[in-house]
From Swiss-Prot:
Changing I183T: Confers resistance to Pycsar-mediated defense. The gene is D20. Residues 21-110 form a coiled coil. It comes from the Viruses. This is Major capsid protein. Belongs to the HK97 phage major capsid protein family. Keywords: Capsid protein, Coiled coil, Late protein, T=13 icosahedral capsid protein, Viral capsid assembly, Viral release from host cell, Virion. Changing I283T: Confers resistance to Pycsar-mediated defense. The lineage of its organism: Viruses, Duplodnaviria, Heunggongvirae, Uroviricota, Caudoviricetes.
Amino acid sequence: MTIDINKLKEELGLGDLAKSLEGLTAAQKAQEAERMRKEQEEKELARMNDLVSKAVGEDRKRLEEALELVKSLDEKSKKSNELFAQTVEKQQETIVGLQDEIKSLLTAREGRSFVGDSVAKALYGTQENFEDEVEKLVLLSYVMEKGVFETEHGQRHLKAVNQSSSVEVSSESYETIFSQRIIRDLQKELVVGALFEELPMSSKILTMLVEPDAGKATWVAASTYGTDTTTGEEVKGALKEIHFSTYKLAAKSFITDETEEDAIFSLLPLLRKRLIEAHAVSIEEAFMTGDGSGKPKGLLTLASEDSAKVVTEAKADGSVLVTAKTISKLRRKLGRHGLKLSKLVLIVSMDAYYDLLEDEEWQDVAQVGNDSVKLQGQVGRIYGLPVVVSEYFPAKANSAEFAVIVYKDNFVMPRQRAVTVERERQAGKQRDAYYVTQRVNLQRYFANGVVSGTYAAS
């Protein structure tokens, strides 16, 4: 793919400011141009940062990477056209790979949407309100089994947009916004589910070949130069097949077939909230305690299967509290993984969290430095170990788990397709059933990488 450098420079907003500087002296022009440039850059960067901050998971990481690339290209362009061209040529593959994210950032940078920010703002006040309306229209179309612009509300919306803009809108764009926002808001509800990288899948089963151990290189003497032994011994590794799969998760709601469209439209935010919360609860619960039967196998189950269930001195009756030293002992069970602090996360029950608050080693989020990476739902740190709280541990009792330490890089969250809405007509009950479905799972590459702590037996 060939990149048009001039077009890219234009999209990056690198035009001149001549029209704004007419009637000024040379010194004034220079000063005013610098002020306007800085002001413009600050506004543009704020808009792009806002777009990145609203994204979650893998989308956010790709947007962050694209944002750094855009900043780099900006800097190179300011220095010289030749340097800019050389940078584009060197990073052509990266630019092509992130082209969708770059387009989104540049659109946000200019304050535009696919129907024009001015139109969205004129009709709904803000872009966020506009997208809320778009989401309702798409969900309503699923409920009514009509096209996005075939419902009464959809027709009125299309008419209003057409009167305000010459841009032709498509239902596909609206459905994309709907799907992205549903996933975004669902992921915001997750704590444990937000810890792991997502693995996009296009089929029910994905097979991956991996090498468990890297093997060792060979030290060779200088005297072996020119012989076969100068390249060292062959590194022999046994490849292992890993099969990734997903489980279907569905949340259901009902609406009677006599309900009018206006009434349904008013209830859509409530319907949406209920379905999202139902999905979040099920994912969090399964990722902690799932048994692998029709649902993901949870972290506590995996720790038990690995014989990595450590009995601690902490007692369920509260006579011996959970302490930082208690948690530190669990890391020993992780072996070499326990040394990689930046890749570990501690998940604790609510009771264990309140115990740790009394520990002198506890750092709440206000004490964690701004340069530290904070996880979604993070409440603090223990010995530098990030801590999140889950309410889906077993009830507090003798021998019950209260904490789990997980090596994040060993786990992945397979996802097949996006969130979908399905409808089922139940004629005998005179109602329609609506399902919000997605296919996800929690899997790991290799055994181990997780350890749980339990209260004492008595």
